[in-house]
C-alpha cells in the first residue's frame, strides 16, 4: 500500500513554522485554479518571476542558533512578485468559493455565503482568521488591540511569501485589498490541510526498516539518507561547510547495506568512464551536425516511403507468386501424370524386355528394334527441347503480363487520383451525379470488362464533358453581356462626371461674382467712411470758427448728412439687388442639380437592376453633398444680408 509523501515520523516535521531556507525555485503554495473542490495532494508550486537570488529566510525556531558560515547566503530586500492572477475576477471567485466550502464543511459557527464573502467587514475577517488559525494553534486567541500588526506577523511566521500591509487590515473588504487577503486565507487553508494530513499519516519507517515504500509521487524514501541529511543539516547550522565524515560514514553504511564488492567498483568506474566518453563523443557529433535529427527524420520519411513502395511491390509479387503457384501446381499435376505414364511405359518395356529375353530374335529383328529405339529417343529429345522452349516462352509471357498489369494499375491509380480531385468518385461525390466512375481492375474478367467500363464510365463521362462545355459557353456569353453592360455604365458615369464638373465650374463662377460684389460693397463702405471722416474734420474746423458763420456751417452739415443717408440707402439697395440676383442664381443651380440628381437616380436604379455589383461608388450622394453645401452657403448669404 502506498503511503503519503508527507510523513509525521522521526524525520518528519510537525511544526508549521517556516523552514530555515526555502527552495529559491519555489515561491510558495499556489492556490489551485480548478473549479472542482480541491483535495489534499501535491500542491502546485510556481517559479518566481525574478531571475535574481532572493532570500526567503523567515524567523528560525531551531535550537542550534544562527548560522555562522558565510557560504550559501544570498540576502536581498527585493519583494517577490505574486504570480497569482489576483486581478482575475474568476480566480477571486474561485478562492471565495474554496473559503466558503471549507468554512461550511468544518463547522464555522457563523453564517457565511458567497455573497457575504464578496466584501466582508473587518470583524467578519477577524472571526474567519481566528477560526482558521485555530486548526494550527487551538489555544490561540486574537488580541483586542493591534490586530493590524498581529495578523501580518502570523502570516509571516507561517512562511507566507507575500507581505500583508497594516493598512490593508483596516480596509479588508475594499476591491483593491480583498483579493490579496482572500488569497492569503486560501493559502492558510492549504497549510491546514497539510498539517491535518501530517497528523493522520503513519510513520514513514518502522523499526529496523531502512527503506520506505514508494509514495504517491513515485519517490522511494531511504532512512539512511534522511539520517544523513539530518546530521549534515545540524552540522551546517553549527557553522560547518564540509561534511567529509558524514559522507564517509554514509558510504560505509551503503556498502554494508548493498554488499558492495570493491573489485566490481573498478569495473563499474571503467564502464562509467567509457559511457562518459561515449556521451562526450555523441555531444561533439551533435555540435558538429546540429541538424542531424532533421536529416534523420527526412531519412526516416524517405525510408518509410521506400518501405511502402516495397510493400506494394511485395504485394504485387505475392499476387504474381500466387498465380505462378497455381500454374506450378498445374505443371506438377502434369508432371505427375507424365511420370505415371512413364512408369506405365517402363512397366510395359520391362514386360516386353522379358518377352524379348524369353524369345529368340533374329539379327534383323534386333537391328529393327534398335533403330526404332533410336528414333524414339530422338523424338523424346526433340519433345524435351520443345517443352523447355514452351516453358521459357511461358515465363516471358508471364513477365510481360506482370509488366502490363503494373502499368494498368499505375494508370488506374492516376485515373482515380484525378477523379477524386474532380470530385467524381466515390459514387455520392459532388460531380458524380449518381454515376459510378470507379474502375475495379479484374484481370480474370477478360475483354468483357472493357465493354462494361466503356458503358459505365466513358458514356457518362462524355455526357458530363458536354454539359460542362455548355455551362462554360453560357458563362462566357453571360460574361460578354456583363462586360457590355459595364462599358455602358462606365460611359454613363463619365457623362455624369462631366455634367458635375460643368456645374462645379458654374458654381465657382458664381462664387467669384459674389466675392467681387462683396469687395465692391466694402470699397464703397470705405469710401463713405473716408468721406465721413473728412466731414468730421470739417465739422471740427467749423466748430473752431463758429463765430465766423455758425448758421452756414449747420446748413452745410445737414446737407452733407442728407447726402450720406442717400449714399447709404443707395448702397443698401445695391446690396439687396445683388443678394436677390445671387439667390435666384443659386435656386436655378439647385433646381438644375435636383433634376440632374433625379435623372441620375433613375439611371442608377436601372443599372442596379441589370448588374448590381458594377456600381463602385454612389454619385448621387456626392451631388447631394454639393447641393447641401451650396444651400448652406445661400442661407449664410441671406442671413448676412439681413
Curated annotation (Swiss-Prot):
Signal peptide: none annotated. Residues 1-445 are annotated as: Interaction with the N-terminus of CDCA1. Keywords: Acetylation, Cell cycle, Cell division, Centromere, Chromosome, Coiled coil, Kinetochore, Mitosis, Nucleus, Phosphoprotein. GO terms for biological process: attachment of mitotic spindle microtubules to kinetochore; attachment of spindle microtubules to kinetochore; cell division; centrosome duplication; chromosome segregation; establishment of mitotic spindle orientation; G2/MI transition of meiotic cell cycle; kinetochore organization. Residues 1-74 are annotated as: Disordered. GO terms for molecular function: cyclin binding; identical protein binding; kinetochore adaptor activity; microtubule binding. The keyword S-adenosyl-L-methionine does not apply. The modification N6-acetyllysine is found at residues 53, 59, 527. The modification Phosphoserine is found at residues 44, 55, 62, 69, 165, 242. Residues 251-618 are annotated as: Interaction with NEK2 and ZWINT. It is found in: Nucleus; Chromosome, Centromere, Kinetochore. Residues 361-547 are annotated as: Interaction with PSMC2 and SMC1A. Residues 261-403, 458-642 form a coiled coil. Residues 18-33, 63-74 have a biased composition (Polar residues). Residues 1-250 are annotated as: Nuclear localization. Residues 251-431 are annotated as: Interaction with SMC1A. Residues 128-251 are annotated as: Interaction with RB1. Phosphorylation begins in S phase of the cell cycle and peaks in mitosis. Phosphorylated by NEK2. Also phosphorylated by AURKA and AURKB. Acetylated at Lys-53 and Lys-59 by KAT5 during mitosis, promoting robust kinetochore-microtubule attachment. Deacetylated by SIRT1. GO terms for cellular component: centrosome; chromosome, centromeric region; cytosol; kinetochore; membrane; Ndc80 complex; nuclear speck; nucleoplasm. Residues 446-642 are annotated as: Interaction with the C-terminus of CDCA1 and the SPBC24-SPBC25 subcomplex. Component of the NDC80 complex, which consists of NDC80/HEC1, CDCA1, SPBC24 and SPBC25. The NDC80 complex is formed by two subcomplexes composed of NDC80/HEC1-CDCA1 and SPBC24-SPBC25. Each subcomplex is formed by parallel interactions through the coiled-coil domains of individual subunits. Formation of a tetrameric complex is mediated by interactions between the C-terminal regions of both subunits of the NDC80/HEC1-CDCA1 subcomplex and the N-terminal regions of both subunits of the SPBC24-SPBC25 complex. Belongs to the NDC80/HEC1 family. Acts as a component of the essential kinetochore-associated NDC80 complex, which is required for chromosome segregation and spindle checkpoint activity. Required for kinetochore integrity and the organization of stable microtubule binding sites in the outer plate of the kinetochore. The NDC80 complex synergistically enhances the affinity of the SKA1 complex for microtubules and may allow the NDC80 complex to track depolymerizing microtubules. Plays a role in chromosome congression and is essential for the end-on attachment of the kinetochores to spindle microtubules. PANTHER family: KINETOCHORE PROTEIN NDC80 (PTHR10643), KINETOCHORE PROTEIN NDC80 HOMOLOG (PTHR10643:SF2). This is Kinetochore protein NDC80 homolog. The gene is NDC80.
Amino acid at each position: 500500500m502506498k503511503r503519503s509523501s508527507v510523513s509525521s515520523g522521526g524525520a518528519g516535521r510537525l511544526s508549521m513554522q517556516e523552514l530555515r531556507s526555502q527552495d529559491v525555485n519555489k515561491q510558495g503554495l499556489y492556490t489551485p485554479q480548478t473549479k472542482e473542490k480541491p483535495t489534499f495532494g501535491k500542491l502546485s508550486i510556481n517559479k518566481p518571476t525574478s531571475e535574481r537570488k532572493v532570500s526567503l529566510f523567515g524567523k528560525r525556531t531551531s535550537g542550534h542558533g544562527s548560522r555562522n558560515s558565510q557560504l550559501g547566503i544570498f540576502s536581498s530586500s527585493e519583494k517577490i512578485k505574486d504570480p497569482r492572477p489576483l486581478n482575475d475576477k474568476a480566480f477571486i471567485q474561485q478562492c471565495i468559493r474554496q473559503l466558503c466550502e471549507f468554512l461550511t464543511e468544518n463547522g464555522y459557527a457563523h453564517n457565511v455565503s458567497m455573497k457575504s464573502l464578496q466584501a466582508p467587514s473587518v470583524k467578519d475577517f477577524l472571526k474567519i482568521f481566528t477560526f482558521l488559525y485555530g486548526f494550527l494553534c487551538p489555544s490561540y486567541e486574537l488580541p483586542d488591540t493591534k490586530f493590524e500588526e498581529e495578523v501580518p506577523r502570523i502570516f509571516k511566521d507561517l512562511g507566507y511569501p507575500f507581505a500583508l500591509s497594516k493598512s490593508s487590515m483596516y480596509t479588508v473588504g475594499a476591491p483593491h485589498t480583498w483579493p490579496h487577503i482572500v488569497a492569503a486565507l486560501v493559502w492558510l487553508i492549504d497549510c491546514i490541510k497539510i498539517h491535518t494530513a501530517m497528523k493522520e499519516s503513519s510513520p514513514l519507517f518502522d523499526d529496523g526498516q531502512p527503506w520506505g515504500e514508494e509514495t504517491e509521487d513515485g519517490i522511494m524514501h531511504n532512512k539512511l539518507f534522511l539520517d544523513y541529511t539530518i546530521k549534515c543539516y545540524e552540522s551546517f547550522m553549527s557553522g560547518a561547510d564540509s561534511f567529509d565524515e558524514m559522507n564517509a560514514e554514509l558510504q560505509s553504511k551503503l556498502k554494508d547495506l548493498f554488499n558492495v564488492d570493491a573489485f566490481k567498483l573498478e569495473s563499474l568506474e571503467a564502464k562509467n568512464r567509457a559511457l562518459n566518453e561515449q556521451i562526450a563523443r555523441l555531444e561533439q557529433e551533435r555540435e558538429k551536425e546540429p541538424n542531424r535529427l532533421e536529416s534523420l527524420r527526412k531519412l526516416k520519411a524517405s525510408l518509410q516511403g521506400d518501405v511502402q513502395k516495397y510493400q506494394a511491390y511485395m504485394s504485387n509479387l505475392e499476387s504474381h507468386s500466387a498465380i505462378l503457384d497455381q500454374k506450378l501446381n498445374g505443371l506438377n499435376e502434369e508432371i505427375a501424370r507424365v511420370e505415371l505414364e512413364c512408369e506405365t511405359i517402363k512397366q510395359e518395356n520391362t514386360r516386353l524386355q522379358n518377352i524379348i529375353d524369353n524369345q529368340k530374335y533374329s539379327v534383323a529383328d534386333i537391328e529393327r528394334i534398335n533403330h526404332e529405339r533410336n528414333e524414339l529417343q530422338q523424338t523424346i529429345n526433340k519433345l524435351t527441347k520443345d517443352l523447355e522452349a514452351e516453358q521459357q516462352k511461358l515465363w516471358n509471357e508471364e513477365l510481360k503480363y506482370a509488366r502490363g498489369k503494373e502499368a494498368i494499375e499505375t494508370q488506374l491509380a492516376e485515373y482515380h487520383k484525378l477523379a477524386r480531385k474532380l470530385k467524381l468518385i466515390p459514387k455520392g461525390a459532388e460531380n458524380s451525379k449518381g454515376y459510378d466512375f470507379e474502375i475495379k481492375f479484374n484481370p480474370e474478367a477478360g475483354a468483357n470488362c472493357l465493354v462494361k467500363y466503356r458503358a459505365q464510365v466513358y458514356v457518362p463521362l462524355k455526357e458530363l464533358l458536354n454539359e460542362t462545355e455548355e455551362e462554360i459557353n453560357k458563362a462566357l456569353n453571360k460574361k460578354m453581356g456583363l462586360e457590355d453592360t459595364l462599358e455602358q455604365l462606365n460611359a454613363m458615369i463619365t457623362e455624369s462626371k462631366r455634367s458635375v464638373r460643368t456645374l462645379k465650374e458654374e458654381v465657382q463662377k458664381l462664387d467669384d461674382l459674389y466675392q467681387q460684389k462683396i469687395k465692391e460693397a466694402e470699397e464703397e463702405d470705405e469710401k463713405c467712411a473716408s468721406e465721413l471722416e473728412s466731414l468730421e474734420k470739417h465739422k471740427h474746423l467749423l466748430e473752431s470758427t463758429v463765430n465766423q458763420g455758425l448758421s452756414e456751417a449747420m446748413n452745410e452739415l445737414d446737407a452733407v448728412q442728407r447726402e450720406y443717408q442717400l449714399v447709404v440707402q443707395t448702397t443698401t439697395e445695391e446690396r439687396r439687388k445683388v443678394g436677390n440676383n445671387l439667390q435666384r442664381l443659386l435656386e436655378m443651380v439647385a433646381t438644375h442639380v435636383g433634376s440632374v440628381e433625379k435623372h441620375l437616380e433613375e439611371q442608377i436604379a436601372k443599372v442596379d437592376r441589370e448588374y448590381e455589383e458594377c456600381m463602385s461608388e454612389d454619385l448621387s450622394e456626392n451631388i447631394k453633398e454639393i447641393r447641401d453645401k451650396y444651400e448652406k452657403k445661400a442661407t449664410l448669404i441671406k442671413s448676412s444680408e439681413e
